[in-house]
A protein has these predicted regions:
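N-terminal beta1-alpha1-beta2 submodule of the flavodoxin-like/Rossmannoid cofactor-binding fold
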Residues: 1-107
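Short, glycine-/small-residue-rich phosphate/pyrophosphate-handling segment
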Residues: 108-115
Length: 115
């Protein structure tokens, strides 16, 4: 069975809502989906000052330490918001951590998409 990862970073939950809809659509055609979120890098005090809601407990956290899990997926969907025209640091941290996977060709042939 085809196995897709949806990897998101969602500070206020908007990207998470999109991710959940996309997950339902992918699953509706018989594809297995694992919903992941980037590890938060902002201190809890900053998140509180920004009035950020708690992270969803049903979405597993992907960290630089376990980023090699991406090797096991047939494809990856990236859910990212824009921060002043760039991707959030939390997503960039995960992407930077995939250097070893890239160097060893472990991401070659994987389908990818961004929303």
């Amino acid at each position: 069975m085809t196995n897709i990862a949806i990897l998101e970073y969602s500070l206020y939950g908007h990207i998470n809502q999109l991710s959940r809809s996309i997950k339902k659509g992918i699953e509706s055609v018989g594809v297995e989906v694992q919903h992941l979120r980037c590890a938060e890098t902002l201190p809890s005090e900053v998140l509180e000052q920004m009035h950020a809601p708690p992270k969803p407990e049903d979405v597993r956290e992907l960290t630089p330490a376990n980023v090699n899990e991406l090797e096991g997926f047939d494809g990856i969907m990236f859910g990212v918001s824009a921060r002043y025209g760039g991707i959030p640091a939390q997503m960039k941290t995960i992407m930077d951590a995939t250097g070893g996977l890239w160097q060893n060709g472990k991401l070659v042939g994987k389908t990818a998409g961004v929303f």
